[in-house]
């Protein structure tokens, strides 16, 4: 299963490391917003005013608020483990919008 995550892990790790605000759309249409605090094979820990554990099987799309360069991680940094933990990040004004439908 490591080959299937060869794009996913560097992308999520770049979002975590750079503390990029993200919108995560779930398969049921709910939109969550915040910063990726950490992730593993099955879940993403999303931090806004509170931390939420979001199961990856429930995620449809992850949309960063700005472009990130995630391919530069292939030359060695921090992808040796399947668990990535971020430092406790500075507070953001990101919020959860569970009622939004478009």
From Swiss-Prot:
GO molecular function, one term: RNA binding
Record's keyword annotation contains Glycosyltransferase: no
Pfam (any one): Hfq
Key words, A-Z: RNA-binding, Stress response
CC per GO annotation: cytosol
Domain called Sm: residue spans: 9-68
InterPro entries attached to this UniProt entry: Hfq, LSM_dom_sf, Sm
Coiled-coil zones: none
Gene Ontology biological process terms, A to Z: regulation of DNA-templated transcription; regulation of RNA stability; regulation of translation, ncRNA-mediated
Positions of the UniProt region annotated as Disordered: 63-102
Segments of skewed composition (Polar residues): 70-96
Protein role: RNA chaperone that binds small regulatory RNA (sRNAs) and mRNAs to facilitate mRNA translational regulation in response to envelope stress, environmental stress and changes in metabolite concentrations. Also binds with high specificity to tRNAs.
Subunit details: Homohexamer.
UniProt record similarity statement: Belongs to the Hfq family.
Protein name per Swiss-Prot or TrEMBL: RNA-binding protein Hfq
Organism: Citrobacter koseri (strain ATCC BAA-895 / CDC 4225-83 / SGSC4696)
